[in-house]
Swiss-Prot record:
It is found in: Cytoplasm. Belongs to the TRAFAC class OBG-HflX-like GTPase superfamily. OBG GTPase family. An essential GTPase which binds GTP, GDP and possibly (p)ppGpp with moderate affinity, with high nucleotide exchange rates and a fairly low GTP hydrolysis rate. Plays a role in control of the cell cycle, stress response, ribosome biogenesis and in those bacteria that undergo differentiation, in morphogenesis control. It comes from Rhodopseudomonas palustris (strain HaA2). This is GTPase Obg. One of its GO terms (molecular function) is GTPase activity. The gene is obg. GTP binds at residues 166-173, 191-195, 212-215, 279-282, 308-310. SUPFAM superfamilies: Obg GTP-binding protein N-terminal domain, P-loop containing nucleoside triphosphate hydrolases. Monomer.
Length: 353
């Protein structure tokens, strides 16, 4: 299952059914009177946050959704049936935007949450409705009202308690694979991770969801590398774990590069609680490690944790620091399911809007 976090969709609710013009015709009844029924109501377009989903890939292959039209009224005072609503199922964390991609319509945060995106048109009145003391045989009926139609954008922001950020090849995927059951692709080249990965982490008996976000490079907010499109997935995180590669040229500059991209994306993201860790400490000599630690401490204005995703050194301390910020709230079943599903997702590939 491929990962897709944005899709453009056309929706249309059902038109209302037309009212009917009919008269009662029975033997020995000369003036039967009107008995045309009303038209049925058109179906609604409903969006529902479903459990077990972690991608919008279904909307890559189908972009048009139309609800049923209401059935027309009939004679003998028979009203038309209402049109069947159509339900679009999306992952928890999905946001609905108007066609301008800026106007937020709804944000789904809980499993089972439903939102009526377009209401069906009302059915028209049959001629029986217009019978009065002065008009005993009306010969007109109302047509059904048209349904609503619009283009919308679906945008997914994965729900996680903590997010991993850093430059490409900083060891984020290795860290996630060591602390959870997630199986991200790991290799010794930049941009190995092409889509967000989720893992459920247990630290001191407390569970939380950790998201691995594809690496950022300088100029990501302008589209360089993979761009900053995946940063939306950490907007909901309560804390960020910023990993810096100890084998890089200058740990302080690496830290400032990522911080600059976070600030360029959104001030709220840059203001999140951040835990800084110097990773891959097993791959450098003690003297070089001390230099890198000092550089990072000056840049971050805090003492970084020293960890190694390969050997596990310092990893428990990092997890305890994350858990302390997140608190003791247990992870939801939805988050666990999303993490398991995300671990089996195929690599992300660019998709057309």
């Amino acid at each position: 299952m491929k990962f897709l976090d944005e899709a453009k969709v056309y929706i249309r609710s059902g038109d209302g059914g037309n009212g009917c013009v009919a008269f009662r015709r029975e033997k020995f009844i000369e003036f039967g009177g009107p008995n045309g029924g009303n038209g049925g109501r058109g179906g609604d377009v409903v969006v529902e946050a479903a459990d077990g989903l972690n991608t919008l890939i279904d909307y890559r292959y189908q972009q048009h959704f139309k609800a049923q039209k209401g059935v027309n009224g009939m004679g003998s005072d028979r009203h038309g049936a209402n049109g069947k609503a159509i339900v679009l199922k999306v992952p928890v964390g999905t946001q609905i935007f108007d066609e301008d991609k800026e106007t937020l319509i709804h944000d789904f945060t809980t499993v089972g949450e439903r939102f009526v995106l377009a209401e069906g048109g009302n059915g028209g009145f049959g001629n029986a409705h217009f019978k009065s003391s002065t008009n005993r045989a009306p010969r007109h009926a109302n047509p059904g009202l048209p349904g609503e139609e619009r283009w919308i954008w679906l945008r997914l922001k994965l729900i996680a308690d903590a997010g991993l950020v850093g430059l490409p090849n900083a060891g984020k995927s290795t860290f996630l694979s060591k602390v959870s059951a997630a199986k991200p692709k790991i290799a010794d080249y930049p941009f190995t991770t092409l889509h967000p990965q989720l893992g459920v982490v247990n630290a001191d008996g407390r569970e939380f969801v950790l998201a691995d976000i594809p690496g950022l490079i300088e100029g990501a907010h302008e589209g360089a590398g993979l761009g900053d499109r995946f940063l939306g997935h950490v907007e909901r995180c309560r804390v960020l774990l910023h990993l810096i590669d100890a084998t890089c040229e200058h740990a302080g500059k690496a830290y400032k590069t990522v911080r600059g991209e976070l600030e360029a994306y959104a001030e709220t993201l840059a203001d999140k609680i951040e835990i800084v860790a110097l990773n891959k400490i097993d791959a450098v000599e003690p003297d070089e490690l001390k230099k890198q630690k000092d550089r990072l401490k000056r840049a971050a204005k805090k003492t970084p944790l020293l960890i190694s995703g390969i050997t596990g050194q310092g990893v428990p301390e990092a997890l305890r620091a994350l858990a302390a910020v997140i608190g003791e709230a247990p992870v939801s079943d939805k988050a666990k399911g999303a993490a398991d599903n995300a671990a089996n997702a195929e690599p992300w590939a660019p998709q057309d809007a």
